[in-house]
Amino acid sequence: MDSNTVSSFQVDCFLWHVRKRFADQELGDAPFLDRLRRDQKSLRGRGSTLGLDIETATRAGKQIVERILEEESDEALKMTIASVPASRYLTDMTLEEMSRDWFMLMPKQKVAGSLCIRMDQAIMDKNIILKANFSVIFDRLETLILLRAFTEEGAIVGEISPLPSLPGHTDEDVKNAIGVLIGGLEWNDNTVRVSETLQRFAWRSSNEDGRPPLPPNQKRKMARTIESEV
């Protein structure tokens, strides 16, 4: 096993522990708490994949961080912070919408790269909107936290979420996954639109009807993908 992989996991475990202590003092805002929960799932998945104990890794990560801080001067810290581009966290969904449990009458699941796509194939003839919480850097989608499909009545009928065991995805991965979800929902004569915020930062455009600019051949391909897996 690569030593950098192990040490990276150890540092991530310790930093999560620090953030958890911060949250326990009721100091974290909604985006902070949301990332904390999702990073916990990711660490559990990575720990299982690597065969490493999280508690032991946290202690080792603490030693690594302490060693770095002992060697770090205040001036070097200022320069590092100034050179790192800041990302923004954007929210279409409330914390309640993100954390709400939902159930599918006819469940369908597909894995696309490091993203998991889920939808209820029992939903028909509905108006559906896709909402997402994600981070943005350089005015482009950086990391998807969670995307969910809602009916006009507020019911959740679909979802795209990162796989905890496979961290890392691009904006193209997200757009492709959205295409799969749209294709599956439209196959049952649902009308799907994407939130203006998601259109703006994923496709850098905004259509009045809420339709992302998916090429016609891609939409046909997505519909066939869903159909073939039913």
UniProtKB/Swiss-Prot annotation:
Region annotation CPSF4-binding: where it falls in the sequence: 180-215
Placement of sequence motif Nuclear export signal: 137-146
Mutagenesis / variant outcome for changing E71G: Abolishes the formation of closed homodimers, open homodimers are still able to form
Region RNA-binding and homodimerization: start-end pairs: 1-73
BP terms from Gene Ontology: symbiont-mediated suppression of host cytoplasmic pattern recognition receptor signaling pathway via inhibition of RIG-I activity; symbiont-mediated suppression of host gene expression; symbiont-mediated suppression of host mRNA processing; symbiont-mediated suppression of host PKR/eIFalpha signaling; symbiont-mediated suppression of host type I interferon-mediated signaling pathway
Location relative to the cell: Host nucleus; Host cytoplasm
Region (PABPN1-binding): 223-230
Keyword RNA-binding on entry: yes
Protein origin, superkingdom: Viruses
Region (Disordered): 205-230
Sequence motif Nuclear localization signal, residues: 34-38
InterPro entries: NS1, NS1A, NS1A_effect_dom-like_sf, uS15_NS1_RNA-bd_sf
Pfam families hit by this protein: Flu_NS1
Family indicated by similarity: Belongs to the influenza A viruses NS1 family.
Function: Inhibits post-transcriptional processing of cellular pre-mRNA, by binding and inhibiting two cellular proteins that are required for the 3'-end processing of cellular pre-mRNAs: the 30 kDa cleavage and polyadenylation specificity factor/CPSF4 and the poly(A)-binding protein 2/PABPN1. In turn, unprocessed 3' end pre-mRNAs accumulate in the host nucleus and are no longer exported to the cytoplasm. Cellular protein synthesis is thereby shut off very early after virus infection.
Subunit note: Forms homodimers and higher-order oligomers. Interacts with host TRIM25 (via coiled coil); this interaction specifically inhibits TRIM25 multimerization and TRIM25-mediated RIGI CARD ubiquitination. Interacts with human EIF2AK2/PKR, CPSF4, IVNS1ABP and PABPN1. Interacts with human DLG1 (via PDZ domains 1 and 2) and human SCRIB; the interaction results in the translocation of DLG1 and SCRIB from the cell membrane to perinuclear puncta. Interacts indirectly with human LIN7C via its interaction with DLG1, the interaction facilitates translocation of LIN7C to cytoplasmic puncta.
Domain notes: The dsRNA-binding region is required for suppression of RNA silencing.
Protein name: Non-structural protein 1
Species in which this protein is naturally found: Influenza A virus (strain A/Blue-winged teal/Minnesota/993/1980 H6N6)
